[in-house]
From Swiss-Prot:
GO MF terms, alphabetically ordered: monoatomic cation transmembrane transporter activity
Name by which UniProt lists this protein: Putative transport protein YidE
A Gene Ontology biological process term: potassium ion transport
Keyword Iron tagged: no
Main location: membrane
One Pfam family this sequence matches: TrkA_C
The family this protein is said to belong to: Belongs to the AAE transporter (TC 2.A.81) family. YidE subfamily.
Residues annotated as domain RCK C-terminal: 191-276, 279-361
Length: 553
């Protein structure tokens, strides 16, 4: 059997063993996708004992490509809601994540001085404990630049391998422990997160208001500022027993009932101007109007603003709200349509059918994946991650690397949505398949590389003490900040788990957090919110520690 065939076969075996381990649960808690790492260590040990030779170049390519696939699909998934989340809660999340990095660096410095751990070893333990491979590479590079002998630099890789598996376990254990301590109901947390997801952090509401302000009598809707803006949509008007879709030129009269859509604060302002809320139903049942949800799939309308399509004027149809990647938005005129947007339309059946034809509403297109944008995005992400950033006083340039670059590029492209006929929407099933494939490939290789000398170092060397040091570097920051975030900031549990995983730049921990609830995207969103800044800090922290320890001896 050729080296390539043998390598692929071993990787498949690792995936099977690891996924089996991950599916084993104790009291409902399992390793999930993180089990692949331990499957790799087990198989790697026996591969080493049998003297098998695997293709190191192929393993390296598979590891990096798997990581790229994982972070890219995460970015595409959360991109549409990422920047809205950043405005609402991003500062708080990033402050907690930075605190985790700082505490981890302090614990590392204390361990280095107290136990006189060699610099390469402690940097490797730090990188493994925070499960950050780019930190390992950055640390090795600066050690070489500082003139450290190669045999000492290689020790960094072994100590990294010792700390890495238990770094992952530490994150999973912390999530589980916090869940037990605070008696978290995951379903309740998911519902609370879902209820707070909108562009401004408030749930989109509807309200029926009676026109009671005499100053509004006989005015056109376009002449009433609060109804002609982008914060509130008037989707229905009822006069006596007649229900109709209002247009900008529709004249309102005292006693008219208006069905308004918007955020609670804006609807409250509308009440102050227009009149009181009423319990009268403005349902389309039994009328010649209907409400339908239509999906944007026509490439000709991508990137166009809602107001430029003139649906009200041409078809007498109102877009009452817009759902983008699970986030409910007020359908303001300035919003540009993206592939996969779901629009709530109100109008007559024939008019809605005409608008649906304009928008596309081709359900089969939602199941298709455009592969060209995928590889364009990955290529641009790799280029972004390869750009060196020179910082005064640093002997080596800093880079986002193959993990940070594709993630940031995917966030940007996911937010843009489309450029011309290229759209970065990816069906959820396809996104999940690529994401799971990527993380399985990445963890399989990491486990295989660690498995060869893992048992020997653990039993006969200083492996146990290295693991202990790594456990402290992992656990102390996570537990401290986790308790603070829950007690002081009342942070949502799923959001907190994503923040903890992101603060350790740990894809397996994110996979575990995602599996806590089958449909909630809270963990992925908070992970992506903190990941870019934390990745940069994780890359420069070992370099800062190396320069600091080297200078003070």
């Amino acid at each position: 059997m050729s080296d390539i065939a043998l390598t692929v076969s071993i990787l498949a075996l690792v995936a099977v063993v690891g996924l089996f381990i991950g599916n084993v649960k104790f009291r409902g808690i399992g390793l999930g996708i993180g089990g692949v790492l331990f499957g790799g260590i087990i198989v790697g040990h026996f591969v080493s004992q049998a003297g098998m030779t695997l293709s190191s170049d192929m393993l390296h390519v598979i590891q990096e490509f798997g990581l790229i696939l994982f972070v890219y699909t995460i970015g595409i998934q959360v991109g549409p809601g990422f920047f809205a989340s950043l405005r609402v809660s991003g500062l708080r999340l990033n402050l907690f994540a930075v605190l985790i990095v700082i505490i981890g660096g302090l614990v590392t410095a204390i361990l280095h001085k107290l136990f006189d751990i060699p610099l390469p070893v402690v940097l490797g333990i730090f990188s493994g404990a925070v499960t950050n491979t780019p930190a390992l590479g950055a640390g090795q590079q600066i050690l070489r630049d500082l003139g450290t002998p190669m045999e000492m630099v290689d020790q960094m890789g072994m100590s990294y391998a010792m700390a890495y598996p238990f770094g992952i376990c530490g994150i999973l254990f912390t999530m589980w422990m916090l869940r037990v301590i605070f008696r978290v109901n995951v379903e309740t947390e998911a519902q609370q997160h879902e209820s707070s997801r909108t562009n401004g952090g408030a749930l989109i509401k509807t309200i029926n208001i009676r026109v009671e302000n005499p100053n509004l009598h006989d005015l056109a809707i376009k002449d009433v500022p609060i109804l002609n803006g982008d914060k509130i949509i008037c989707s229905r008007l009822k006069r006596e027993e007649t229900l109709k879709v209002p247009s900008p030129d529709t004249i309102i009269q005292l006693g008219d009932l208006l069905h308004l859509v918007g955020q609670p604060a804006d609807l409250h302002n509308a009440q102050l101007v227009i009149g009181q809320e009423v319990d009268t139903s403005l349902s389309t049942k039994g009328t010649d109007l209907r409400v339908e949800r239509v999906v944007v799939t026509n490439e000709n309308v991508l990137g166009k603003r809602i107001r430029d399509l003139h649906f009200k004027e041409r078809y007498d149809v109102v877009i009452s709200r817009l759902n983008r990647a699970g986030v409910e938005l007020v359908a303001s005129g300035d919003i540009s349509l993206q592939f996969g947007d779901i629009l709530n339309l109100v109008g007559r059946p024939s008019a809605i059918d005409a608008v649906a034809n304009v928008l596309g509403n081709a359900q089969q297109k939602l199941q298709q994946v455009q592969m060209l944008p995928v590889f364009i995005g990955i290529g641009l992400g790799v280029l972004l991650g390869s750009i060196p950033v020179f910082v005064p006083g640093f002997p080596a340039a800093l880079k986002l690397g193959l993990a940070g670059g594709p993630l940031i590029m995917a966030l940007i492209l996911g937010r843009i949505g489309s450029i011309g006929k290229l759209y970065w929407f990816m069906p959820p099933s396809a996104n999940l398949a690529l994401r799971e494939l990527g993380i399985v490939l990445f963890l399989s290789v990491v486990g295989l590389k660690s498995g060869g000398d893992f048992v020997n170092t653990l039993v006969n060397g200083e492996g146990l003490s290295w693991i202990g040091y790594g456990a402290l570097i992992t656990a102390v920051p996570l537990i401290t900040v986790g308790i603070l975030a829950r007690m002081l900031a009342k942070m949502n549990y799923l959001t907190m788990c994503g923040m903890l995983a992101g603060s350790m730049t740990d894809p397996p921990a994110l996979a575990f957090a995602n599996n806590l609830h089958p449909t909630s995207g809270a963990a992925a969103l908070s992970y992506a919110t903190v990941y870019p800044l934390v990745m940069f800090l994780r890359i420069i922290t070992p370099q800062l520690l190396a320069v600091l320890f080297w200078s003070i001896g």
